[in-house]
Amino acid sequence: MRVDRAREAALDALAACRRNGAWIDGALKQVLKRDGLSGRDAAFASRIAYGVMQSRIYLDRCLARCLTQRPEKLEPLLLDILRIGAYQIFLMDKVPVNAAVNEAVEMAKAHKLSRAAGLVNAVLRNVDRKRGEPLAFADEFEALSVQTSHPRALVERMVGLLGAEEAEAFLRADNEPVPTTIQTNTLKTTAKQLRASLEDESVTVEPHPWLADCFTVSGTGDLEGLRAWREGWFTVQDAAAKLTALAAAPKAGSFVIDTCAAPGGKSFAMAMCMEGKGHILSCDMEEHKLRLMEAGAERLGIECMEVRLADGRVCDEALAEKADVVVCDVPCSGLGIIRKKPDIRYKDMASLAGLPAIQSAILDNASRY
């Protein structure tokens, strides 16, 4: 039996995160491109990869009661296969249990884990049988940690900050589906033309409820395979990023400094507000991110944007009091975008301690421009 390509792509993306410390969005993007997956296959692979990353703690607890050893003691690849199977059983109603189990068994065989194929079959069948049995928890923190798949340290932090009721709502919201929002590149096309092009390729398109020239889209896991993407007719952008440009309201001919610009979305939105006229200086500390921004600007036909390697904490005296608009999307914990980047929840909370000082230094410096 041939292994399903979409499930295999999800497994490869999860393995890249585990081995290389990659983020799931970037890892998945590379795998989909490598394997030439698009449309429903890409969407299915994305659902599984994001879902397993998002629900890992819950899945491991469900697997643990069907194993004779702790899940983390298993070979990592085998554990990922079990997680993929369990995710489909618990959280993908449209996937038949037999299909989820059989595909997991075939993946184990394909990766030379033949001896484990029987284990995969037995464990996932047992997982299905025990679906209706409640899990046991030591206290309310553990219950919330497992039920929402957030590390206990993060649960305790959020309860301390928000109180139990609001923290639970916050953590559960992290697991809600993420709408994909795109902005029409008004430098190249119109919202009407963009929508028609997307619908011609069977993408489901809905106007954004309160942002002009923006849409929410679904029905494809690989936006970069679309004609409209190749033509530079749109960019993927959260509503919050678009609102930043609208609030700043740069005019045609403005000089804008974007101090922490990568991956470039806010700079792109500013360029569209400015009708492509003026000068946007988009800065970042990592050279490979500059190349990504340059490629994005080229695809979108943005010629008023200059990228520069720069530390936002260090003032360029030549720019003092020269800017009409300064944008500072300072480095942050990312806890507010876990819904979009589920792997952030597994960050070590201690690593966040130095962020306020960095943020303050960047803002102090930017105020001089």
Language-model segments: residues:
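S-adenosylmethionine
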Residues: 1-369
